[in-house]
Amino acid sequence: FRNRLLFPVHDVRGRCIGFGGRVIHEGDLPKYLNSPETPYYRKSLVLYGLYQGMEEIRKSREIICVEGYLDVIRLHEYGFKNAVAPCGTALTEQHLQLVKRYAERVILLFDGDDAGREAARTHGRLFLPHQLEASVVMLPDGSDPDSFLLDHGADAFRELLLKQMPVLDYLLQQTLSKYPDSLQGKLKALDELLPIFAEIKDQTLKQMTLNAVAEKMGLPTSCLLYTSDAADDSGC
């Protein structure tokens, strides 16, 4: 951790269990380093900022999940004290179980670049089997939460949060927009959507989703229902 800015990581009881370190003078060194895992510090079980934001999270029953340590610190500084981030890893099922102990809603807030959009898709799918309300907010191109707050302030950030999109709607929109409105394009989109359908455990929501996608694709719902059921049976 020499010549690095250190971020103490706490468990839910407030005990310091590890550190994240950001390089001060960027060069050939890795930008971030984290403490090695121990019986007390396991990255898949810890969210940075959760302990510090516990009071606000319990009150609002909502969490804003961002990508990095500096994003969490900036959000807390500007009054958004329910912000958390994974410690140098992707969100995991264990993280979701931790979140469900304290919150009912999660806002996924990612950087406005290709990596951020991919993270929103990957992390968003993780929520589909769970009874946990999740939505996605994408920042403008080239922005991250830290820089957006510095450039535009808290009021603009609140307005941005109002534009959140339910995670399932986001996944469908992102997938359908990738392909042309042709037979081949629809087949490719459907192939990518099948695993998403399979992860929706609520049957009413699944049927509503199939209806909406069928309408957008100009296909009969029975076609999507048959394809989805076949994919479920094959373990897709």
Residue ranges and their predicted role:
Residues 1-102, 106, 119-120:
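Phosphate-handling DNA/RNA-contact segment within nucleic-acid enzymes
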Residues 11-12, 54-63, 90-106, 110-228:
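A charged alpha-helical hairpin associated with nucleic-acid processing machineries
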Residues 23-24, 113, 235:
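Short, glycine/serine-rich, charged loops/turns that create anion-binding
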Residues 80, 142, 233:
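ATP/adenylate-binding site constellation spanning eukaryotic-like Ser/Thr protein kinases
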Residues 226-236:
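Single conserved hydrophobic/aromatic residue that forms the stacking wall/gate
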